[in-house]
Amino acid sequence: MNKLTTKLVVAIGIGAALYGVLGLWGFSIAPNTFIKPALAILTVFGALFGPVAGLLIGLIGHTVTDTIAGWGIWWGWVISSGIIGLAMGLIQKRVGFSVKHGTYNNRDISYFTIAGLIGIVIAIIFAGSFDIIVMGEPFDKIVIQVLGATIADVIVFLVLGLPITIGLAKSNRKHTHLKIEK
């Protein structure tokens, strides 16, 4: 989707709210680093609505998380969520792929997986670099955070986001292998 339609704006609002609130919940694995199932929201909404929606859901949703949590807005990590959402939405650019219509093939899934993994790595490295250069955070702390966040996001993407997105696409297929018995 390239046009900013009412449907897309509503999807961005719902996605950002879900990502923002669910982002408050997670399992600690390193200093200020959590496994957050909310990343699955970015995966699904990016695949459904495209890179612009994924980007905005990540940016707005992470800002909501940081604001509600009260620890201040960490812009490097906010931008990294936007980058991840954008990467997840790139699958929409593949002709023939549609979660809504249940159309995809193995190449689409491979593309989605690779784009998602590369997006996660780029985003987390960006956030860590931003924290060191702009925020003045100690290098050794950021290395632990970057490694932890990368592992956490990859796990959530592969275990929740990808299977949920594929499951939605499968459930939206227009044809089945069911046969009417006579």
Swiss-Prot record:
The subcellular localization recorded is:
Cell membrane
- Provide the topology term for how it sits in the membrane: Multi-pass membrane protein
Q: Which UniProt keywords apply?
A: Cell membrane, Membrane, Transmembrane, Transmembrane helix
Q: Does the keyword Membrane apply?
A: yes
Q: Name one GO cellular component term.
A: plasma membrane
Entry keyword Transmembrane: yes
- Mind telling me which residue stretches traverse the membrane in this protein? 9-29, 40-60, 71-91, 114-134, 142-162
UniProt family annotation: Belongs to the UPF0397 family.
List the PANTHER family: UPF0397 PROTEIN BC_2624-RELATED (PTHR37815), UPF0397 PROTEIN SPR0429 (PTHR37815:SF3)
User: What is the protein's given name?
Assistant: UPF0397 protein BcerKBAB4_2500
